[in-house]
């Protein structure tokens, strides 16, 4: 059984990106820039934003964080986004979710220039993904990271049955569309399951590649997986654990101990898919810079 090490792959990718940024700087005299906007003081969001800024610095990219109070109006946020859309030094714009209730997330997503939407959430980028124009869009970072893992571990995907459990706009839907593409890392027959799917085990047991992104701790158990399947666990859930220092531990959507005994390859939680998300955000931002500069 292979443990798919996302932490290791993300470090390899960051090293590659650092070398690419150095080469771009030598050629163009400038580097990619990412601006992250955070509205309010959600503790988890603040941690994510700090990690993104740290990762940018590690590969030599410019990084700016705009911190706004929780009572920021939608109009004010839209003005900031418009200014960033017109700033040639900014190649990626990300508004950290969740946002306060007075701000409509879809309106904000629409306001970001699709050419700078390195999160891959804009409908134009999603539409290009569906149509197979991957060279002209940005793919949502978590699905993109999973594709990178499959490729780097040489997982055979062509013609395989991929079952995606979860239908979110951030992971499930783009993941299913990505696995349909005629790529070395995908080209699958795809089934998507969700909370209203009856007898879900009938579908998951057919999966050669099972991607769990449903947001429920230990939802996928050994009796739901066929022997030899490749299992990708997107979930990250807190469960109470009195023996842990913080009183909780992190688990995925897959019951790791049981499923890993059956799987041919599996991602752990933590250390699997999670580290890849920021790495792919960096990759998208570098790609944005290259497109703008015709490279």
From Swiss-Prot:
<comment type="subunit">
    <text>Homodimer.</text>
</comment>
<dbReference type="InterPro" id="IPR020630">
    <property type="entry name" value="THF_DH/CycHdrlase_cat_dom"/>
</dbReference>
<dbReference type="GO" id="GO:0009086">
    <property type="term" value="P:methionine biosynthetic process"/>
</dbReference>
<dbReference type="GO" id="GO:0035999">
    <property type="term" value="P:tetrahydrofolate interconversion"/>
</dbReference>
<keyword id="KW-0028">Amino-acid biosynthesis</keyword>
<keyword id="KW-0368">Histidine biosynthesis</keyword>
<dbReference type="GO" id="GO:0005829">
    <property type="term" value="C:cytosol"/>
</dbReference>
<dbReference type="GO" id="GO:0004488">
    <property type="term" value="F:methylenetetrahydrofolate dehydrogenase (NADP+) activity"/>
</dbReference>
<comment type="similarity">
    <text>Belongs to the tetrahydrofolate dehydrogenase/cyclohydrolase family.</text>
</comment>
<keyword id="KW-0560">Oxidoreductase</keyword>
<protein>
    <recommendedName>
        <fullName>Bifunctional protein FolD</fullName>
        <ecNumber>1.5.1.5</ecNumber>
        <ecNumber>3.5.4.9</ecNumber>
    </recommendedName>
</protein>
<keyword id="KW-0521">NADP</keyword>
<keyword id="KW-0378">Hydrolase</keyword>
<dbReference type="InterPro" id="IPR046346">
    <property type="entry name" value="Aminoacid_DH-like_N_sf"/>
</dbReference>
<comment type="pathway">
    <text>One-carbon metabolism; tetrahydrofolate interconversion.</text>
</comment>
<comment type="function">
    <text>Catalyzes the oxidation of 5,10-methylenetetrahydrofolate to 5,10-methenyltetrahydrofolate and then the hydrolysis of 5,10-methenyltetrahydrofolate to 10-formyltetrahydrofolate.</text>
</comment>
<dbReference type="InterPro" id="IPR020631">
    <property type="entry name" value="THF_DH/CycHdrlase_NAD-bd_dom"/>
</dbReference>
<keyword id="KW-0511">Multifunctional enzyme</keyword>
<dbReference type="GO" id="GO:0004477">
    <property type="term" value="F:methenyltetrahydrofolate cyclohydrolase activity"/>
</dbReference>
<dbReference type="Pfam" id="PF02882">
    <property type="entry name" value="THF_DHG_CYH_C"/>
</dbReference>
<keyword id="KW-0554">One-carbon metabolism</keyword>
<feature type="binding site">
    <location>
        <position position="236"/>
    </location>
    <ligand>
        <name>NADP(+)</name>
    </ligand>
</feature>
<dbReference type="Pfam" id="PF00763">
    <property type="entry name" value="THF_DHG_CYH"/>
</dbReference>
<dbReference type="InterPro" id="IPR000672">
    <property type="entry name" value="THF_DH/CycHdrlase"/>
</dbReference>
<dbReference type="GO" id="GO:0000105">
    <property type="term" value="P:L-histidine biosynthetic process"/>
</dbReference>
<dbReference type="InterPro" id="IPR036291">
    <property type="entry name" value="NAD(P)-bd_dom_sf"/>
</dbReference>
<dbReference type="GO" id="GO:0006164">
    <property type="term" value="P:purine nucleotide biosynthetic process"/>
</dbReference>
<dbReference type="InterPro" id="IPR020867">
    <property type="entry name" value="THF_DH/CycHdrlase_CS"/>
</dbReference>
<keyword id="KW-0486">Methionine biosynthesis</keyword>
<feature type="binding site">
    <location>
        <position position="195"/>
    </location>
    <ligand>
        <name>NADP(+)</name>
    </ligand>
</feature>
<keyword id="KW-0658">Purine biosynthesis</keyword>
<feature type="binding site">
    <location>
        <begin position="166"/>
        <end position="168"/>
    </location>
    <ligand>
        <name>NADP(+)</name>
    </ligand>
</feature>
